[in-house]
Amino acid sequence: MAAGKYGTIVADPPWHYPFGHPAREHKKHPYPTMTIGQLCELPVSDWADQSAHLYLWTTNEHLRYAFGVLGAWGFTFKNVITWCKPGLGMGGTFRNSTELVLLGERGKHELKRRDVGTWHVWPKAQENSRKPDAFLDLVESVSHGPYLEMFARRNRIGWDTWGNESLEHIDYTFGWTAAA
């Protein structure tokens, strides 16, 4: 793939959760995960155009690390989008009912529109970790392509996808193995 191709990248990393907590001992990761170091080593800055947006999904538990990943990939933090989910999820302190998306910018990547709020109530997806289709609709309405979705769970017309759960994907090999 040519360097500097994508104007917008969406990433939903397989954050590693240490399930050593007694409440989580019965759980297993439903997919291979990556450590913070492995995520930071991905050459995302090579894939992004000189002017680009990055939408980086994170959980409350990984928020402090997500800023470092965003920076390692060559982006500057600009804003956060909050997905307010119906119902309660898991959580050690509070039961999480939100997920966060950090918006990073590289260069000066103009927005198509500026009338978008920072919180959204989208339906909860049926599959584990799947994000709402309405989110990618929002991204397309705000940011310019070409588009790449990293760690994709499905294919989308007009997007390149990379991930072990999409039907067709760009085959990048980095030599990493799932986190223990």
Regions of interest found by a model, annotated:
Residues 1-180:
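Class I S-adenosyl-L-methionine-dependent methyltransferase catalytic core
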